[in-house]
Amino acid sequence: MTQNQTSAATPLGIKPGAQSSGVIFSLPRLRRLVAQLRFGLLPRKANGMYSAVPDAAMKRVYIQDDWPKSWKYSYTYDLEEIYGEYTNRGYAYAYDHRRKQILRLFTERLAPDARILDIAAAQGNFSIALAEMGYNVTWNDLREDLADYVRLKRERGKIDFAPGNAFELKFPAPFDAVLIAEIIEHVAHPDEFLRKAAQLVKPGGYIVMTTPNGAYFRNPLPKFSDCPDPSIYEAVQFKPNGDGHIFLIHPDEIKPLAAQAGLEVEEIALFNNPLTNGFMKMEHVLRLMPQGVVNRLEFASQHLPAPARRNFMVHMAVRFRKPVKSV
């Protein structure tokens, strides 16, 4: 691992293979974080999730009676994610934190003209954000009718559209990077899914993945590595507009899954604590808090010791790298 790669894995991430000291809390460290939170002195480091990532900007559209049902359904999510018309602040804030993680993980490694495939991109908000930052993006989803909805919202940037099963399509060349955001928890065979995604990336390229953190202390779903026969879930995967999760991947499953797919793990970032995510009946508290305070709470929670983050944080972002084979 290069010096640049090592620095990118901290302070937000977990270094693959790192050993925990077993210390959950340090009183001086906790006091320092509380003081920073109180006086708004939390640092903005170059590899932090609140630095060098543009705010969400997208063409404002308004629902029309003649829109397809899939557009109207997607629009309800855009009201929360993009346009700031909150009915669930926890969901909206969690999306914003996830978006910042995704963009950070790409911009730390890729030049602006890189080619990125966004698999299961739905209403295309990540595709549009990446395109506006100068990347050459290919939007992909099983729902072809959503492509025109993405076109309606886009103002600038290059996006190609490739609807269908990404693993069955013929692309002209491997991509510099692939994004799989909030999809692997919906498939019966996450190991096979990651392996097929890796085949779409050129050597030296990257996969950025986000998914709920299976080690979160209130997660009721099974661990993939504990399931003897994942095929029993095949009938319920890839449902259109499906919100049902099959497995939630645990951080300690990431490295074995990567090895099976021929990938290296560069960074595992755990983020979105239960308060900023609106869990544990905290939504009413979020309504009383300025978003800047919410963001500082989120930033502070990402500086907890690794064992605490592993079980306390709700979401996970991973950057994989496909190694260049030696000659």
PLM segments and residue spans:
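S-adenosyl-L-methionine-dependent methyltransferase catalytic module, highlighting the catalytic core
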Residues: 28-42, 46-97, 142-149, 153-154, ...
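Conserved alpha-helix/loop element of class I SAM-dependent methyltransferases that forms part
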Residues: 94-112
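Nucleotide donor/acceptor-binding cores
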Residues: 113-114, 164
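Conserved beta-strand/loop positions that form the S-adenosyl-L-methionine
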Residues: 119
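Conserved glycine-rich SAM-binding loop
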Residues: 122
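Class I SAM-dependent methyltransferase SAM/SAH-binding core
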Residues: 125, 129-168
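A short acidic, Gly/Pro-enriched loop at the edge of an enzyme's catalytic core
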Residues: 167-178
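A short beta-strand submotif of the Rossmann-like class I SAM-dependent methyltransferase core
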Residues: 180-183
